Every structure is written in C-alpha cells, then in structure tokens.
C-alpha cells in the first residue's frame, strides 16, 4: 500500500487516475474497494483461509466493525498483518528485511485489534549459505518477538523462481529452517515457502510440531504451473 502501487490497483478495479484530489482520498477509495471484496457473499472462510492486511487497513472499519474483527467474526477468515518495511539491498545473494523500529508498538496494537498473525518477506536470490542463513536467522529472530507478543508469525523466506541454482538454495533453506524450528521451544510459527524443485522437500516441515501451517508461495509461476507443482 503505497502512493506508487495504489493508483495502479485502483485503475485495474476501474477507478481512473485523477478520481481523487489527494492521497487521503485515494486511500479512502482503496479501502472502499477492499471493503466491497470483504463484504461480498463469495468471500467467506469456506474458500478464503486468511487475509493479509496493511496497518492502515487494520486501523479502519468494514461495515462499521474494525477490519480484523469483521474478517474473523463475520466471515470466519483469519486476519494477518503485514509488519515488514520492505527489503534491504541485495548482499551475498539475499535480501533481508529493512529495520522495523516500531515493531513492538505495532504488535501490541494488532493484538488489541484481534489480529491472529503477521506476514513479513525476505528474498533469496542464489544458493549462498551465508546469505540464506542471514535471511532465516532474521525471520526467526523477529518471529520469536511476534510470538512473545501473542501473535503467530508467517515466516516467509522466498526463493526467487528465476534463481539459477534454485534447487541448491532450497536444500540449504530447508536445513536452516529445520534447525531454527528445532530450537523454538514452545513457540509456534507458520511457513510461506516458494514451490520447490524437489517434490515433498518441505514435508518434514509440514509435520513439525512447531509449525501451525505451511502456505505455498507461487512466486511468479503461472497458476497452471503453480497448481502442477
């Protein structure tokens, strides 16, 4: 949700650029679009497991009800909050997340608003052991803080589908994730993982006691290819 991406999203929805006078009006239009989606009779927990919210969306109302409460209480859809501030520049074949100086206050607010979990994304571009280790360590380090705040983090170390050594990167990643999961104690996490080259690579993670659920990340594959994988 930014001044750059929102006009494009509104344009695809049918609201022409220039239909608003300032950024506040633009975000009001965006929330009206999101509200219409959430209030649709087709949008229920039968087909939609969870919805990821921006902070601004969490702070607003849908049909007079705070967004997260509306999702869970009216629609049986689990609300998650995007907490990361974007990606740092690529170093050693990977992009860790930028610092999140206001994370603790944000988590406290989210907990008070009925949010179940969080979403934060890093990207792995090549099979660099040290780069992948940094990504996974940061994800779990922040994930533990999120657990301590009473929420369930979605750990998302995306592997770029165009990485030339994708299979090798995924093998390294799988090992690093296992090590972190084994060290978690009594905290539980979710995982969001790029569809892998090796079938059932992440089967042990799906079965792991500390993992609530594993979400498939299509990462740019076509729907047909993603479903095949």
Where are these regions (language model features)?
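Alpha/beta catalytic barrel-like cores
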Residues: 1-116, 124-126, 176, 180, ...
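Surface-exposed cleft-lining segments at the edges of enzyme active sites
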Residues: 90-95, 119-133, 160-166
């Amino acid at each position: 949700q930014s001044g750059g991406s929102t006009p494009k999203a509104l344009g695809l929805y049918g609201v022409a650029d220039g239909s608003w006078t300032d950024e506040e009006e633009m975000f009001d239009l965006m929330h009206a679009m999101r509200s219409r989606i959430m209030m649709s009779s087709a949008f229920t927990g039968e087909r939609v497991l969870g919805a990821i919210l921006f902070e601004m969306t969490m702070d607003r109302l849908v049909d007079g009800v705070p967004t997260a409460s509306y999702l869970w209480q009216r629609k049986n859809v689990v609300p998650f909050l995007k907490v990361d501030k974007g990606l740092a520049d690529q170093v050693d074949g990977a992009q860790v997340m930028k610092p999140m100086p206001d994370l603790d206050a944000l988590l406290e607010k989210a907990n008070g608003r009925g949010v179940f979990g969080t979403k934060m994304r890093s990207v792995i571009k090549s099979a660099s052991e040290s780069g992948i280790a940094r990504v996974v360590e940061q994800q779990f380090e922040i994930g533990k803080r999120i657990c301590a705040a009473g929420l369930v983090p979605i750990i998302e170390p995306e592997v770029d589908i165009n990485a030339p050594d994708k299979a090798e990167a995924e093998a390294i990643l799988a090992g690093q994730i296992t090590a972190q999961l084994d060290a978690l104690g009594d905290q539980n996490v979710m995982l969001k993982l790029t569809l892998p080259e090796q079938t059932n690579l992440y089967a042990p993670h799906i079965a792991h006691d500390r993992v609530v659920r594993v979400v498939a990340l299509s990462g740019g594959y076509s729907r047909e290819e993603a479903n095949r994988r």
